[in-house]
Amino acid sequence: GLNITAPIPGAHHAFRAGSTGLALEGILRSGDRRPETVAAIEKAEAWFLKELPRLRRGTVDTMYNVWGHSYGIKALAELYNYRNGDDAKQSALKNLAQTQVQRLKRYEDVNGGWGYYDFDEATQKPTGLPTSFTTATVMMALWKGKEVMGLELPPKEVTRGIEFLKRQQTPDFAYVYSNSHRYRPRYSINRPGGSLCRSTACNVARRVWGDPAPTDEIVKVWLDRLILRNGWVDIARKRPRPHSTHFANSGYFYFYGRYYAMDCVALLPETDRSV
């Protein structure tokens, strides 16, 4: 069988929090307010209020909880808008989101940025494998929380996060996979074909935080690449083994890249948004 690193129950709790956040964000942004949809929103909100305060890393070397904190903040921001006019509910949602910011601060890597593994030192503050895409995910969540709910963010960690993304970028605006990959920029996963689904997230994260380096033209180039080279990540989409196909793409890259591609499209003038 295929060995998956997912220590129970922590890893399962983290993935459930992250996937629930993504689903709830999508439902709320869809504008669907049929009775059965509203019931699902209420149920997910109650689950978040109960479970997110309990979310921690599963073991000292696996920090999948970072995904739950990040997508939890984004879902809470959408709930905050949904509860407009209900001051008590909005206050509870904001307070919960602020605790998630503190958890992200706790799990920031000593090198700057965020990752989800620490196989070597196993320290209280991670010293392991911060990755470009996990850092971009966190930075997008922090930005959304600040813009929508006025969350207080840790300035040092925010600055270090942006600087980490810059260090991961190669001259063609591919982003290497993780911190140690900076020394192997032409390894297959770090080439443009392996960065198709990371560059969307990293480019938009830098832009929303005021970094002008990923220009509109660069954003468009990488959106075009994602569309034209779709086959490479589509092949990976149903492969059970991670990084087993062209340019070491994994199945989840397919969905991750498209999720942030929509944010990239929103950066562009309306005249440039059509394919």
Each predicted region: which residue ranges?
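Preference for long, amphipathic alpha-helical scaffolds in soluble/luminal domains
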Residues: 1-275
